[in-house]
Structures are given as structure tokens and as C-alpha cells.
Amino acid sequence: INNGYGSWAYWNGGAAVSNYHSTIAEGTSNTQLSIPADLAAHSGSNFLMIFGSIDGYNAPVLDFKDGKAHTMKGLWITNGTYFLNVMANGNDFCAKAKSSTQISVVFEGFKADGTTSTGTVKYTVQDGTNSLKSWQYVDLSSLGEISSLKVNYEASEDMKGKYGYNAPAY
């Protein structure tokens, strides 16, 4: 996790283990670590909530604790309630999703040097007005052996503003 800002690291992109749930209507910045109340964690009672941004420097990077390269088979993803509420209703920072809205999560693998990319895998989490609201498996095996995984977003122009990506990046 990027800890360049000390205790504010999560603000700058990062990951947090959570077990919070809320309704989509309650999805605000106060419930940013929540998934829908009717959706259980995929396995166990906790899940990892990742926060990032469309710019390169705020993207969270997950490193393997042992410092060795590994081949990741894949992972399960879903959207958080903050993202889902904004896509359905908009907020002060972002308009609600429309038919042309496209948002994908981009997973990028890196070799031990931290700069050599092994490739990317994209998964669409918002297609027009349709939001991902269930757990979906993302196959990451094509990234090969990686020492770290960067998680970022790619979005259509209607989700960007003067300062970049405006939708919640959770």
C-alpha cells in the first residue's frame, strides 16, 4: 500500500480489509468501505476494498509479502455501495451513469523491478446504466509471474471532470 502520506495513505490510494455492508441508497463517502447489504463477502466474512484513481500515482499497488514473484490465478470483484449510489443518482462531484458510461477496473502486473509491466487485464464494472452488483471472477493468469499488482480505473469522458476521474474509485 502506498504510504507516502503516512496515516493518510488510504486517501492516496490503497486497500483496507472490511466487513461493512449498507444499502445502495446509503452509499456515500461515509460508507465507502461497504458492499450492498444483501451481498455476502465472497468467501469468509471479510473482503478487500481497494481505492484508487484513474491517474497513475494514486493507483494502489499490492505487493507479495515474501517479495517473490507469483502467478495469480485471479480474484473476485464487485462494486461498493458508494460507487453504486453515485452511478444510480449522481452526487455533487459526478453525474449519474448514462447509456454511454463505461468504467473498467484495470489490473496490471509488474516484475520485481517494479517498472516492467507483464500486461494488463480489464474488467468492466459499469456498462452504460448497468452496474456490477454481484461477485464476478477476473482471470489474472495471463499476467504471468508478478511481484506486484497495480489496480486502476479506465473511464469514459462523461465520468471525468476538470481534475480527472469523478466517480468513486472503490
PLM regions and their residue ranges:
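N-terminal targeting leaders for non-cytosolic proteins
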Residues: 1-61, 67
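Intrinsically disordered regions, especially transient/low-confidence alpha-helical propensity segments
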Residues: 5-8, 73, 132
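Short, surface-exposed loop and linker segments with low hydrophobicity and enrichment for Pro/Ser/Thr
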Residues: 35-45, 97-100, 140-146
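A structure-centric signal for secondary-structure junctions around beta-strands
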Residues: 43-46, 69-72, 102-104
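Secretory/extracellular carbohydrate-interaction modules
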Residues: 53, 73, 77-89
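Extended extracellular/luminal ectodomain segments enriched in beta-structured repeat modules
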Residues: 67-74, 145-146
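Short coil-to-beta strand junction motifs in C2/discoidin
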Residues: 86-105
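Terminal, low-complexity interaction segments
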Residues: 104-170
